[in-house]
Amino acid sequence: QIPANMIERIEVIRGGGSALFGSNAIAGTINVITKNPIKNEAQAGVVSSLIAGKAADVVSSLNGSLISDNYTRGISFHALHRARQSYDANGDDFTEITRLRNLNVGAKLFNDFTDRHKLTGEVNMSNENRRGGNKLDEPEHLADIAESIRTQMVGGTANYEYFSPAYNHKFTAYASGERTRADN
């Protein structure tokens, strides 16, 4: 859910059990590396569509960046909201496509204290609610068939880089964390 214009590169690391990512990275990892902002800018957009001419699907997005005059401090941010109505293709009162509410927001900040000291922080939040089946406006236990997913995720990273005076050594300290809650 990160806008393409904010992505610097994507790293694919094959294989499991990496010392860096732990034993849960069974098949490998995919890392999305975001850009540091280089200019002040903002973009906004809305895409609206209809599923079979009946169910609305609206995606709104905003992203941008602010940077100091001397390019030593900056922030980039992004937000996306999606609202999709449920869709019943055959009129049996059961959804073929679930109702969806999704909100994703994030920001990346950086501060270059000097040429040799740099601090970067990133935070992302996602909240998604899906509901399908029938009797969508009632609790799931009152429906004949219910598909329901509620997911909340908050994650962040911090990275500090130090270069030696001769720039022949580099020290990096990195920390990350994530909290995910899923109710299905």
Model-derived features: where do they sit?
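Residues that define the transmembrane beta-barrel architecture of outer-membrane proteins
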Residues: 3, 24-26, 54-60, 99-103, ...
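Flexible loop and strand-edge segments within Gram-negative outer membrane beta-barrel domains
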Residues: 84-104, 110-112, 116-171, 177-184
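Transmembrane beta-barrel domains of outer membrane proteins
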Residues: 13, 33, 63-67, 78, ...
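N-terminal periplasmic accessory domains that precede
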Residues: 1-3, 12, 24-48, 58-62
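Outer-membrane beta-barrel architecture
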Residues: 39-43, 57, 72-74, 118, ...
